[in-house]
């Protein structure tokens, strides 16, 4: 454990940030999984709703620096393409 006051504070801050980032990444995985599941079920309405939610979560995560904005854009693009292919 850190000995200096500032090091102790930084350690606490990094733990809080890590927990927040972990939660955001888990949320991303869950919404992406929901979109992919809807696409596999060939349920266009559910897939479209799940895609809207996924886009929101991905954009928020990118805006907060949890993931890179280009990674978010890439995931959104691929999910949109998958939802578009559902008939």
Swiss-Prot record:
An example Gene Ontology CC term for this record: cytosol
SUPFAM superfamilies in UniProt: Ribosomal protein S20 (SSF46992)
GO terms, molecular function: small ribosomal subunit rRNA binding; structural constituent of ribosome
Pfam entry (one): Ribosomal_S20p
Region (Disordered): 1-26
Key words, A-Z: Ribonucleoprotein, Ribosomal protein, RNA-binding, rRNA-binding
Biological process, per Gene Ontology: translation
Family of the protein in this entry: Belongs to the bacterial ribosomal protein bS20 family.
Its biological purpose: Binds directly to 16S ribosomal RNA.
Protein name, UniProt field: Small ribosomal subunit protein bS20
Organism: Nitratidesulfovibrio vulgaris (strain DSM 19637 / Miyazaki F) (Desulfovibrio vulgaris)
Gene designation per UniProt: rpsT
């Amino acid at each position: 454990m850190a000995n200096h006051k500032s090091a102790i504070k930084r350690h606490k801050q990094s733990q809080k940030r890590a927990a927040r980032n972990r939660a955001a990444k888990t949320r991303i995985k869950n919404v992406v999984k929901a979109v992919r599941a809807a696409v596999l079920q060939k349920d266009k309405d559910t897939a479209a709703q799940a895609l809207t939610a996924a886009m929101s979560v991905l954009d928020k995560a990118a805006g907060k620096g949890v993931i890179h904005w280009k990674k978010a854009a890439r995931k959104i693009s691929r999910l949109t393409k998958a939802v578009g292919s559902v008939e």
